[in-house]
Amino acid sequence: MCSIFYPNYYVEDVFSIDYEKLMSMGYKALIFDIDNTLVPHGADSTNAVDELFAKLNDMGMKTLLLSNNNQARIERFKKSFHTLYIEEAGKPHPQCYHMAVEMLEVKPNEVMVVGDQLFTDILGANRAGLESILVKYIGYYKKEKKGIRRNLEKVLLWFYGHSSRSKRMPSITIDNS
């Protein structure tokens, strides 16, 4: 029952993902959430994120931002790098994930979804038949508002951590200098 909310992998952050390993496993594209996955909610991109997307592009990995944000927010976020995107996506509906796969021009088994929320990013990926990586939520900790969903996520993550499906990806450090 809870497994529809479980990611295939769980890591600290987007910089802990071994992208070379993903490529060696046959993945050709990544679908990223923005807020609280790549940067705190509403924040502009950082040099580290810009460098990550440049590295992924240099590796030949296709990328797409899948966000429930509007176009202006996404355009502002990605002003320093090129990537495809879908705005006002309607996550967790599987249709937006299918559209993303089409835009990336890859097969569903060649895509990995990266996000911070079980109830949108991971649920949507699972419903669309895509694999996923859950990253820990990035937030402004002093202003952090913990809603019911975040508290439910903690409970589900406890069950995930005690399930046979629980996997952590081997990590690498992306040089941020």
Regions found by a protein language model. Give the residues of each.
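Asp-based, Mg2+/Mn2+-dependent phosphohydrolase catalytic module
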Residues: 2-32, 38-177
